[in-house]
């Protein structure tokens, strides 16, 4: 009988659903394992083969852990609010909910066709009112704790999309060709900076890829420095500037402030006022990325004012430049051009002094010297000398001196900025806030606050969302008086900040999550998804989780204990899959042609899970042939009936081979080395085929090992062998350590440390036998002839070394 994957896969998917095979266990006395995918945004284009990689990996682990005795939580849902659905609604007039429901149905169909063992009873959708009720509730907890506030801020405004972009979203939109400018707008902002230190410190407790942790460290951007008060000439005040290099203060030759600095226009002298105003106006139209790009030519304007360097007493010209951001430090910096590349380029461009204060191997007039591993020079006055000191010592001495003079203080700063949370669009969670005529603000008490129906989805010309046009929803009265509802909506990130918690208790109408269930399941043991979410989603989720921890809602400090980033699967042209390149391989196409088990195995066999690798259709043919070999153990060629294997004992060599396979597949599966686990199973299949083995123990063991990878075929063959239970409920095979040990050892023989030959002996042979056999090796004997052996070194099962003279 030929393997008909179409009917067999449908049969088992239907049965799994009917029998709730993958329902989450409720026995809290068992060990638990929570394996989670980064849930998808259900786009109209559907899933391609690259999307399936991470889902397949998580499913293999979920199945493996179930068979290893764990209660497994393996859920799926939909991050369904977002801009693409709204843009489609603007274009077609179709309500976003309609397109979202169609897209979800398409996505779910593909995931079910892959045989993923999700507990679909726990399915969630961020656009369901029963879900976003709790998203709104969490927002109000942030508001009550002073972590959500309104502010008139300069935002990243995308003219084409008519909405605000978070700082973290700007790069992507610019790369896509959108225009991003800065403009002031009333915004809701979340005070993520209040958690900066904890977000940074707790990274050390996480089993995450080091590059992802480093990206978060860089984004948080903690630095230790000194805030220095520079006395202004002709002004009865000071200008504060933050620096991480107080050791270079003697080399500061000018100051630079951000165009948005509150003193920018005040510092402009009469002759400079016009050019200063023009420069400030132009700077405000640029995004932060445009302003701070390392390759851009530095621009600036002199204010006409000066400050005094407290170490030298020399006047420092004060400039305005857009490479300084008001959001970092004080919005003012001291510039030491000899030892900072940006300052050096600016000084050269505007002919400003360059003074060496760190001993440099070259002329700092010709090139900057930025290394810290040198000593201070030209750094002394009547009260303090840094000359000859290293960085750390000079830092401390200067910081102490500045504090003693009351012109500076030590300070920790962060690059992290508060999260601009509101969006000027329709398809997002309404922010549950009422604005009253007397100026007070009160939260909505009756959650969820749902979106009203609208006829047009375009943002208003003033930048408000379409909700501003729905008067019957917008305006109301209650016991506190007349009010106007908040028209901004939440960003797409809101729903994904806490979804992992809702999966634990998705049908709870009384609270976000039941405490007992949360304490059992949290935190997530394995979180699989793309590295592109390193800063955005992961940082935001960690922030919300820490707030919920402080509220007593959750019991863990962090949501995701282990993070794994799968590598991208490229198109067959070795390029990233995209519609514009025409190299997208739709998942449904390969499923129809090869079946789910072949696709699952092939994606995992392509290479290490974390590596980028190209799709190759020829490769999946080889996987299909491998599955055919497995099929023929039970359904030989030209046979319509299943053959029942023999119960005769396995030959010793095959028995050892089987136990080694069990160990290797188990070890590699648990460490996500799926490609080598599959390779080991292929070797075992070839051994069984070559020897004509028809042993029940060997074949059933193979099926149990293969079941997490190819669940449909293994279920079918398991049933054909006479079993009535699902193979998904079978324990994963265990190996006998005595049968796994190597019974032969290859011994390397060295003479004076150089390899001269090898020989093979039974493992654990005594030292005397190893020395005797080593001397007999022909290629070794000639190097011993006529020599005196002064020392013999033996490493059991590995090495013999003769020291001769």
Curated annotation (Swiss-Prot):
Keywords: Aminoacyl-tRNA synthetase, ATP-binding, Cytoplasm, Ligase, Nucleotide-binding, Protein biosynthesis. The keyword Signal does not apply. ATP binds at residue 579. It is found in: Cytoplasm. Its EC number is 6.1.1.4. One of its GO terms (molecular function) is ATP binding. It comes from the Bacteria. One of its GO terms (biological process) is leucyl-tRNA aminoacylation. Gene3D superfamilies: 3.10.20.590, HUPs (3.40.50.620), Isoleucyl-tRNA Synthetase, Domain 1 (1.10.730.10). A motif ('HIGH' region) lies at residues 40-51. InterPro entries: aa-tRNA-synth_Ia (IPR002300), Leu-tRNA-ligase (IPR002302), Leu_tRNA-synth_edit (IPR025709), M/V/L/I-tRNA-synth_anticd-bd (IPR013155), Methionyl/Leucyl_tRNA_Synth (IPR015413), Rossmann-like_a/b/a_fold (IPR014729), tRNAsynth_Ia_anticodon-bd (IPR009080), Val/Leu/Ile-tRNA-synth_edit (IPR009008). It is an enzyme of class 6 (ligase). NCBIfam families: leuS_bact (TIGR00396). This is Leucine--tRNA ligase. The gene is leuS.
């Amino acid at each position: 009988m030929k393997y008909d994957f179409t009917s067999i896969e449908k049969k088992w998917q239907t049965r799994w659903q009917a029998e709730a095979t993958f329902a989450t266990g409720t026995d809290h006395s068992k060990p638990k394992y929570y394996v989670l995918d980064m849930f998808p945004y259900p786009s109209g284009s559907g899933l391609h083969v690259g999307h399936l990689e991470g889902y397949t990996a998580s499913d293999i682990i979920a199945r493996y852990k179930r068979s290893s005795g764990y209660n497994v939580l393996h859920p799926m849902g939909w991050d369904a609010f977002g801009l693409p659905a709204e843009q489609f609604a603007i274009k077609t007039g179709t309500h976003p909910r309609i397109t979202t429901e169609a897209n979800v149905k398409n996505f779910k169909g593909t995931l079910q066709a892959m045989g993923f063992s999700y507990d679909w009873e726990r399915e969630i959708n961020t656009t369901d009112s029963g879900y976003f009720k709790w998203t709104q509730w969490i927002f109000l907890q942030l508001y009550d704790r002073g972590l959500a506030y309104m502010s008139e801020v300069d935002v990243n405004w995308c003219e084409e999309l008519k909405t605000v972009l978070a700082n973290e979203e700007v790069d992507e939109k610019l790369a896509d060709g959108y225009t991003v400018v800065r403009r002031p707008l009333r915004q809701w902002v979340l005070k993520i900076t209040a958690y900066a230190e904890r977000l940074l410190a707790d990274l050390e407790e996480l089993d995450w890829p080091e590059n992802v942790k480093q990206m978060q460290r860089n984004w948080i951007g903690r630095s230790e420095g000194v805030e220095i008060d520079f006395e202004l000439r002709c002004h009865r005040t000071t200008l504060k500037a933050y620096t991480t290099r107080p050791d270079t203060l003697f080399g500061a030759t000018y100051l630079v402030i951000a165009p948005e600095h509150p003193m920018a226009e005040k510092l402009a002298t009469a002759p400079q006022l016009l050019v200063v105003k023009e420069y400030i106006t132009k700077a405000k139209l640029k995004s932060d990325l445009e302003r701070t790009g390392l390759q851009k030519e530095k621009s600036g304007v002199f204010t006409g004012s000066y400050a005094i360097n407290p170490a030298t007493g020399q006047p420092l010209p004060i400039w305005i430049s857009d490479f300084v951001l008001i959001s970092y430090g004080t919005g003012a910096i001291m510039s030491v051009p000899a030892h900072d590349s940006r300052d050096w380029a600016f000084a050269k461009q505007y002919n400003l002094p360059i003074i060496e204060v760190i001993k440099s191997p070259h002329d700092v007039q010709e090139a900057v010297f930025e290394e810290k591993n040198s000593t201070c020079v030209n750094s002394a006055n009547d009260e303090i000398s840094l000359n000859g000191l290293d960085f750390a010592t000079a830092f401390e001495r200067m910081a102490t001196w500045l504090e003693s003079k009351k012109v500076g203080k030590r300070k920790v700063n962060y690059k992290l900025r508060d999260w601009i949370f509101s969006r000027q669009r329709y398809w997002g969670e309404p922010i549950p806030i009422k604005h009253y005529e007397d100026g007070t603000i009160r939260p909505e008490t009756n959650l969820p606050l749902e979106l009203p129906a609208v006829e047009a989805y375009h943002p208003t010309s003033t930048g408000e969302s379409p909700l501003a046009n729905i008067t019957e929803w917008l305006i109301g009265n209650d016991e506190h008086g007349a009010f106007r509802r908040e028209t901004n909506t939440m960003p797409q990130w809101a729903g994904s900040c806490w979804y992992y918690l809702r999966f634990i208790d998705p049908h709870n109408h009384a609270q976000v999550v039941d405490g007992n269930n949360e304490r059992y399941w949290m935190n997530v043991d394995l979180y699989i998804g793309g590295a592109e979410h390193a800063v955005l989603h992961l940082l935001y989720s960690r922030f919300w989780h820490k707030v919920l921890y402080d509220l007593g809602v959750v019991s863990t400090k962090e949501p995701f204990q282990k993070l794994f980033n799968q590598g991208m699967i490229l198109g067959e042209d070795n390029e990233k899959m995209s519609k514009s390149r025409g190299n997208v391989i739709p998942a449904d196409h390969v499923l129809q042609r090869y079946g789910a088990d072949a696709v699952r195995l092939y994606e995992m066999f392509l290479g290490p899970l974390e590596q980028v690798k190209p799709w190759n259709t020829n490769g999946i043919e080889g996987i299909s042939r491998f599955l055919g070999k497995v099929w023929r153990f039970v359904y030989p060629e030209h046979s319509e009936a299943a053959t029942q294997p023999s119960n005769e004992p396995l030959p010793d060599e095959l028995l050892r081979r089987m136990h080694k396979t069990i160990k290797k597949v188990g070890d590699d599966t648990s460490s996500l080395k799926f490609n080598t686990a599959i390779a080991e199973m292929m070797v075992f299949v070839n051994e069984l085929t070559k020897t004509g083995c028809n042993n029940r123990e060997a074949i059933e063991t193979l099926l149990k090992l293969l079941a997490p990878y190819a669940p449909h075929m293994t279920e079918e063959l398991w049933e054909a062998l006479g079993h009535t239970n699902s193979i998904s409920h079978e324990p994963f095979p265990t190996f006998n350590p005595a049968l796994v040990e190597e019974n032969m050892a290859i011994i390397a023989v060295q003479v004076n440390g150089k390899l001269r030959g090898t020989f093979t002996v039974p493992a654990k042979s005594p030292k005397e036998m190893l020395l005797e056999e080593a001397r007999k090796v022909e290629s070794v004997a000639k190097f011993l002839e006529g020599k005196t052996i002064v020392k013999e070194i033996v490493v059991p099962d590995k090495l013999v070394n003769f020291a001769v003279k």
